C-alpha cells in the first residue's frame, strides 16, 4: 500500500518510533490522506514527548478522536 510506505517514510524522517501494528491502525482508522496522517503523526509525537510515553494504541485512539 502506497499510503503505508509514505507514512513509514514520514515516521523515519521525523524519527518517530511507532510499531507497524499501530501504524496500520492509524491508517485504517483516520482519514486516508497524507496531509491528515502527517498532522496526526506530528501531534502524536508532540503528545508522546510531553507525556514521556511511547506512541501506543491508546494515544493513537485519543488523538484520532480529538481530530
PLM features: residue spans?
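Amphipathic alpha-helical transducer elements in NTP-driven molecular machines
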Residues: 1-4, 20, 34, 41
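Short conserved motifs of the RecA-like P-loop NTPase core
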Residues: 3, 17-29
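C-terminal helical "lid" of AAA+/P-loop NTPase domains
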Residues: 24-28, 35-49
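Short, hydrophobic-biased amphipathic alpha-helical segments
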Residues: 33, 40, 56-60
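Conserved C-terminal helix/linker of AAA+ ATPases
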Residues: 48-66
Amino acid at each position: 500500500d502506497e499510503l503505508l510506505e509514505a507514512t513509514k517514510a514520514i515516521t523515519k524522517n521525523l524519527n518517530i518510533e511507532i510499531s507497524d501494528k499501530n501504524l496500520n491502525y492509524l491508517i485504517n482508522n483516520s482519514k486516508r490522506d497524507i496531509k491528515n496522517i502527517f498532522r496526526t503523526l506530528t501531534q502524536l509525537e508532540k503528545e508522546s514527548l510531553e507525556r514521556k510515553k511511547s506512541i501506543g494504541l491508546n494515544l493513537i485512539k485519543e488523538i484520532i478522536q480529538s481530530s
